[in-house]
């Protein structure tokens, strides 16, 4: 009986380790000089095929910059295209670049993923 219980606990813990249900965004914090390039990376939840990039400035609500489904850009109308670019080269990575950075780019940038 004790062996069967131990076996169940180990399998449950292993199963929990295999499911990593979170979006990873790097860097977590970035302070840069004006004019520098900033690259943000997003690793979506495994199995999610849609990635969203949002920005929230001090005086505004959350605004959608761009989103991708199956690596293809579906809407990037919220992104200033003169200095911003976004891409999703594969199913495990999306990037948002700002070049050159300006003081008005100071904001919190969010990445989210979905099905």
Swiss-Prot record:
SS bonds (residue pairs): 42-111
| Keyword Transferase (UniProt) | no
The Gene Ontology biological process annotation of the record reads: adaptive immune response; cell surface receptor signaling pathway
One Pfam family, short name: V-set
Q: Output the SUPFAM superfamilies linked to this UniProt entry.
A: Immunoglobulin (SSF48726)
Cellular localization per UniProt: Cell membrane
All copies of the Ig-like domain together span 22-115
The terms describing its cellular component in GO are:
plasma membrane; T cell receptor complex
The alphabetical list of record keywords is:
Adaptive immunity, Cell membrane, Disulfide bond, Immunity, Immunoglobulin domain, Membrane, Receptor, Signal, T cell receptor
* Keyword Signal set for record: yes
Its assembly, as annotated, is: Alpha-beta TR is a heterodimer composed of an alpha and beta chain; disulfide-linked. The alpha-beta TR is associated with the transmembrane signaling CD3 coreceptor proteins to form the TR-CD3 (TcR or TCR). The assembly of alpha-beta TR heterodimers with CD3 occurs in the endoplasmic reticulum where a single alpha-beta TR heterodimer associates with one CD3D-CD3E heterodimer, one CD3G-CD3E heterodimer and one CD247 homodimer forming a stable octameric structure. CD3D-CD3E and CD3G-CD3E heterodimers preferentially associate with TR alpha and TR beta chains, respectively.
Chain's role: V region of the variable domain of T cell receptor (TR) beta chain that participates in the antigen recognition. Alpha-beta T cell receptors are antigen specific receptors which are essential to the immune response and are present on the cell surface of T lymphocytes. Recognize peptide-major histocompatibility (MH) (pMH) complexes that are displayed by antigen presenting cells (APC), a prerequisite for efficient T cell adaptive immunity against pathogens.
Report what the protein is called. T cell receptor beta variable 12-5
Which species is this UniProt entry from?
Answer: Homo sapiens
Q: Which gene encodes it?
A: TRBV12-5
């Amino acid at each position: 009986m004790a062996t069967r219980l131990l076996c169940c606990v180990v399998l449950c813990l292993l199963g929990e380790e295999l499911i990593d249900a979170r979006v990873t965004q790097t860097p977590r914090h970035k302070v840069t000089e004006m004019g520098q390039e900033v690259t943000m990376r997003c690793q979506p939840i495994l199995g999610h095929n849609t990635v969203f990039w949002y920005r929230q400035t001090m005086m505004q609500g959350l605004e959608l910059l761009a989103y991708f489904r199956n690596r293809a850009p579906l809407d990037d109308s919220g992104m200033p295209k003169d200095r911003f670019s976004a891409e999703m080269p594969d199913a495990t990575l999306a990037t948002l670049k700002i070049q050159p950075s300006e003081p008005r780019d100071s904001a919190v940038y969010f990445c989210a993923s979905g099905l």
